[in-house]
Regions:
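AMP-forming adenylation/ATP pyrophosphatase catalytic core
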Residues: 126-133, 138-367
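ATP-dependent adenylation/nucleotidyltransferase module used to activate substrates
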Residues: 1-157, 168, 176-178
């Protein structure tokens, strides 16, 4: 037996196939599924399906029983509400666009998995994420998955080296098509054909506006009609409340300017939304703040090598772009990145993730 592994299970194909692979490799597997919320307001349960729904929890438990290993349902509702949902609300109400998956991975899926693993005597933790772990100069790094289309390192950049030391990514060297084929070979035809959800797990139909209205007590007082302005401050028209817009948005603006208009800036304090052209969304630099106590991205960090180019991703679906220069955060202050070519849609609240030689060397939250 190679060791005891606590596997985070969602009931979906990725974690289920991860269990199959770990068992075949000789690990003792223990399944764990999170109960993160249960009210209609916090509402993936309202649609009855999804990674956190009652159905998915029961499916994970059923799959574990079929494969012959124990399964635990762990109540993380309070932690999830405090760390993930409240941050999601606060960021949107501040005029920023958050990425809750980043916080969930570091604080819930790893922070709590490690705690539960210790309680159950597990040596390792594992998930069905598409990522790998590599060693360089005595340090462990996240590395891009073999399936570049599914690579999830963008969402995992906050993981610390200590967390990586105990982590196994069974799917890191596989493509999604290979994972589906493994599921079919083990008799999970329905799971192999099941469509993947791209929604935020606690927001029904990705309608974050309805979610905010239901979860912010003074929503109607804080979210009111305001001014659309151009980059020079000229008033162009009236918007329906700043939280209804995100950087780069073009559709649903409710205003005709004779040319395509995009949201380029949101100011929650003044309730103003700036509109501009597509070119106004191009930037050659950005500022970011660190969001981890790990040693990465400090000026004395030995992980950053000067003889290898660095690239950055500012969105999950975007390509990593070359970084020509950078100023790293000191004493938890902000840092700056400068790009060779203009980058489209730099969005406050989203993550920027830094790579060298396919390894994640750090990241931050765009400001």
């Amino acid at each position: 037996m190679k060791g005891k592994v606590l596997l985070g299970m969602s009931g979906g194909i990725d974690s289920t196939v991860s269990a199959m692979l770990l068992l075949e490799q000789g690990y003792e597997v223990v399944g764990c599924t999170f109960r993160t919320f249960d009210s209609i307001k916090e509402s993936c349960l309202a649609r009855e399906k999804g990674c956190c729904s009652v159905e998915s929890i029961m499916e994970a438990k059923h799959n574990a029983e079929q494969m012959g290993f124990e399964h635990h349902i762990v109540d993380f509702r309070e932690t999830f509400r405090r760390c993930v949902i409240q941050n999601f609300i606060d960021e949107y109400m501040a005029g920023r666009t958050p990425n809750p998956c980043v916080l969930c991975n570091s604080h819930i899926k790893w922070g709590e998995l490690v705690r539960v693993a210790d309680e159950l005597g597990c040596d390792y933790i594992a998930t069905g994420h598409y990522a790998r772990i590599r060693e360089r100069d005595g340090h462990l790094y996240l590395a891009a998955a073999a399936d570049t289309r599914k690579d999830q390192t963008y969402f995992l950049w906050m993981l610390t080296e200590d967390q990586l030391r105990r982590t196994i990514f069974p799917l890191g060297d596989l493509t999604k098509d290979q994972v589906r084929e493994i599921a079919r070979q083990h008799g999970y035809e329905t799971l192999a054909e099941k469509k993947e959800s791209q929604e935020i797990c606690f927001v029904t139909d990705n309608d974050y506006r309805t979610f905010l209205r239901a979860n912010v007590p003074d929503y109607d007082e804080r979210v009111r009609a305001g001014e659309y302005v151009d980059k020079d401050g000229k008033v162009l028209g009236t918007h329906q409340g700043y939280v209804n817009y995100t950087i780069g948005q073009r559709k649903g603006l409710g205003i005709a300017l004779g040319a395509p208009a995009y949201v380029t800036h949101i100011d929650a304090a003044t309730n103003r939304v700036t509109l501009g052209t597509n070119d106004d969304l191009l930037a050659t630099e950005l500022r970011f703040r660190p969001m981890t106590n790990d040693t990465r991205l400090t000026t004395n960090d030995q992980r950053l090598t000067t003889n290898s180019p660095m690239t950055a991703k500012v969105r999950y679906r975007s390509q990593a772009v070359p970084v020509t220069n950078y100023q790293l955060p000191i004493n938890n202050q902000t840092g700056s990145l400068f790009f060779r070519e203009p980058v489209w849609g730099v969005t406050p609240g989203q993550s920027v993730v830094l790579y060298q030689d396919g390894l994640v060397v750090g990241g931050g939250i765009i400001i």
